Amino acid sequence: MESYHKPDQQKLQALKDTANRLRISSIQATTAAGSGHPTSCCSAAEIMAVLFFHTMRYKSQDPRNPHNDRFVLSKGHAAPILYAVWAEAGFLAEAELLNLRKISSDLDGHPVPKQAFTDVATGSLGQGLGAACGMAYTGKYFDKASYRVYCLLGDGELSEGSVWEAMAFASIYKLDNLVAILDINRLGQSDPAPLQHQMDIYQKRCEAFGWHAIIVDGHSVEELCKAFGQAKHQPTAIIAKTFKGRGITGVEGKESWHGKPFPKNMAEQIIQEIYSQIQSKKKILATPPQEDAPSVDIANIRMPSLPSYKVGDKIATRKAYGQALAKLGHASDRIIALDGDTKNSTFSEIFKKEHPDRFIECYIAEQNMVSIAVGCATRNRTVPFCSTFAAFFTRAFDQIRMAAISESNINLCGSHCGVSIGEDGPSQMALEDLAMFRSVPTSTVFYPSDGVATEKAVELAANTKGICFIRTSRPENAIIYNNNEDFQVGQAKVILKSKDDQVTVIGAGVTLHEALAAAELLKKEKINIRVLDPFTIKPLDRKLILDSARATKGRILTVEDHYYEGGIGEAVSSAVVGEPGITVTHLAVNRVPRSGKPAELLKMFGIDKDAIAQAVRGLITKA
């Protein structure tokens, strides 16, 4: 254990005074807003005071400085006390706290990154610790810096499985630069938390997950100072026994006060009572950090060379992804890869082989994997690429949604999409993923159809802001592009055209190749079709689609290895809605599939070359 230097009585009293000022600010802000969670703030007041004004090292006027210690408020509903901390530190004006939750203020009801001191958005509970793990992993293994990471969790969110995924991850990777503080205030939103104040059980659970676990009185600044000063040979959990509404007579420890601001008259009485306990108005200055984090530049990362494929050769886009990522890894040591124990299927194992120190095995914990990536990406320290079966990203949709709210720049590659994976059956088939990722506000959705396009998608994703999703397929398909083909986000490609095309057919991945095969069948009948590769499903190349449709008598046929809802067909329909003389016909998977050979399943669900040819004939006959 490190030697513990007990703060003198003056410092301890100053920390107590700071905690009470944080309480007062939280109460004032929530009362002014008419909403918020003052009692949840009050249970954490001493924790926040000791953390920010005794333990943490940071530049108070530069919250995102790369050398600073990191803090994640996983119990995001306690945002007012986070804002109060930064006012106490001098970064925010005290008066700004009274604008909490106003549309004109950046002080949202829960933390968001438009605030310079917030790295990741929280409020959807159970996700903060995973992001903190990503920050700690980056600090220990990539930056090799001395900054530490602190995460404050509520006891209610400890029912979330994602918390324990993160606990396991931190232990496996020996994140001794990570401290989780559990604010055990006994009460959840509508009922007491399941373990209430059974502190020994919390301790045993943390220890079982490989953490150094310390029980403290969460309202004793001295005990907190001592706990934060303990040994750092493994991740540390400080299990703080606290009381919701601490310091408020008649409210402390009582149920039914969650998310309820105090009426003005009541707030004034409470504030007067708390204020009477403050002995000094003197503020504690933040301690600056050790400046040993390396300078990092992740802008404009480019492939070291063009693709090296040969037209006509066959490769699965999932394998092309692995090769492309490994190649991009040679362009920057800040390209990192994460996988959920599927690296031999997603082919991220190629990256691991070439860059073992930058590969993070997250095991079968997809929610945590996404949170880890978000943490790794904070402060522009890395460019993360996560991979697993596309179907399994659906489990992490809330984490992906919160990543968008966090303004995070992460890249997710989902393999094994659609019925074309074959015999493994419907549990492994991604048929909802396009709908899911299209709905995310900051997303770019790549759907490459050959090895060249896949390599370009990886390069573009590394340089595109927001959430990038790359959809890859299991079957091997022919290379259709030359290695020097230029690709851009939102730019589709015309793969096949003639002056007398009668229908525009839009497919991607496996179905693009089926469309090309259908074109060969139809050509024998003297029917020409135009074949489009959208490349990105979001954003969609509306202009090229409209131009092609107008050149083919207004007829568009979309074909996709995905359910009807939310996929390529609906994206195209939305793009052309209101345009006169244009009709869109959809071919897609229309029910829960089954096991079978890929060709059998494509035929069964009407998305193979024969179904496309038949649909084209039907459209022409209608005319």
From Swiss-Prot:
The modification Phosphoserine is found at residues 104, 295, 345. Mg(2+) binds at residues 155, 185, 187. GO terms for biological process: pentose-phosphate shunt, non-oxidative branch. The modification Phosphothreonine is found at residue 287. It catalyses: D-sedoheptulose 7-phosphate + D-glyceraldehyde 3-phosphate = aldehydo-D-ribose 5-phosphate + D-xylulose 5-phosphate. The modification N-acetylmethionine is found at residue 1. The modification N6-acetyllysine is found at residues 6, 11, 144, 204, 232, 241, 260, 538, 603. Pfam families: Transket_pyr, Transketolase_C, Transketolase_N. The modification Phosphotyrosine is found at residue 275. Substrate binds at residues 37, 258, 318, 345, 416, 424, 474. This is Transketolase. The lineage of its organism: Eukaryota, Metazoa, Chordata, Craniata, Vertebrata.
